[in-house]
Amino acid sequence: MTMPTEGTPPPLSGTPIPVPAYFRHAEPGFSLKRPGGLSRSLPPRPPAKGCIPVSRLFPPRTPGWHQPQPRRVSFLCETSEPLQSPGYDPSRPESFFQQNFQRLSRLGHGSYGEVFKVRSKEDGRLYAVKRYMSPFRGPKDRTRKLAEVGGHEKVGQHPHCVRLERAWEEGGILYLQTELCGPSLQQHCEAWGASLPEAQVWGYLRDILLALDHLHSQGLVHLDVKPANIFLGPRGRCKLGDFGLLVELGSAGAGEAQEGDPRYMAPELLQGSYGTAADVFSLGLTILEVACNMELPHGGEGWQQLRQGYLPPEFTAGLSSELRSVLAMMLEPDPQLRATAEALLALPMLRQPRPWNVLWYMAAEALSRGWALWQALVTLLCWLWHGLVHPASWLQPPGPPATPPGSPPCSPLLDSTLSSSWDNDSIGPSLSPETVLSRITRRTSTPRGRYIPRDALDLTDVDSEPPRGPCPTFEPRNLLSLFEDSLDPA
């Protein structure tokens, strides 16, 4: 296949459903990542129903998997046994998760579930527990969600794969307890805010290739390799997780495989061809994204160009020639010619871990811990200084708020001490306060029927008070009398 030259994008072809030409202006090219929060965070889903549907015609039947008691989930044994723990009391209303774990923080959440950082009350160790948001909607939905547990058990133990401790279902909700890892690669890149150093990229690439080689050697395909499913461990070691879309090649369920994120999808998946080469292509796009701080397109012409082996030179110009050649091997459009994980690990630049990678990780971790210690020390010194300067302010209880002293009522119209810098001739003759008050009284639209002294303002503090004239009286009359007066000839 002819490769497009630099600056000449390839035509829109190569997939069973080509993108129409009028979509070319939808995404005019490739762009950098948008600064800010999580760009891929989804809006919260509406609250799901907490109970199974109930029919009015047939008696309600509660399925066996919708029991309130927790039951262990495992595909290694034939029967599902009840979950037992020394700190769990079935008579209490709290769930097994609430009784056996201390929730510390929430690590992340998505459209289907949320992950918590917890401390086990059994052994005191830290774990991560993933809890699905909604209960099982039926047998098919339960089978689809339990597939993640089966994927973890098929993968087994590997230093670059997230380890599953146990899984259970309670009240129709699935829980997965895994080892605690650091933030995901997506969160790490968004916190970094720029392209990752190439030393880190090489280390991440080698770790995930080791995980994929372990999966592919057992005939397993991940089908959802992306930065959100790659987690950082101690000393910068990466681990691959989220095996919900895992497919075993040659099995009966391989034809019902589901695709992952379309931004990292291999082109052969659109034709229904599932293989280990799809994971290598997704990993290549992941490395291209984190190494170039590039926003991968969801579709359009840019999506087609990446599936035809086109690497945008404006992004890859800052990469080394070795990394560009590895990306070209991983993003080969033909899955038969695409390099495998085993072949990539045999390359000289990926055969052994680079020594400066470990030094970089150790220096970054030491700097992070030193900065946290410095912040804690500054906070302690500020607290001690405040206690020495104001020793009694933090010992005595706070008193009631003081009320400001009341000020005597003032009347701007009667205050003869007010002066103005304006020219008196320019604004007319000067008037005394008594004259102004009498004019205001005469211009009142609704006269009062009787003057009551308590309705007047308290002007006892004023030196001189103007004499009050007689107030006009008003005699109320009904409409009939007014109508008769109008008919009476003058």
UniProtKB/Swiss-Prot annotation:
It holds the Pfam family Pkinase. SMART domains: S_TKc (SM00220). The modification Phosphoserine is found at S31, S85, S111, S134, S464, S486. Residues 389-490 are annotated as: Interaction with PIN1. Residues 1-20, 33-67, 444-476 are annotated as: Disordered. A motif (Membrane-association motif) lies at residues 373-389. Residues 7-19 have a biased composition (Pro residues). This is Membrane-associated tyrosine- and threonine-specific cdc2-inhibitory kinase. It comes from Mus musculus. The lineage of its organism: Eukaryota, Metazoa, Chordata, Craniata, Vertebrata.
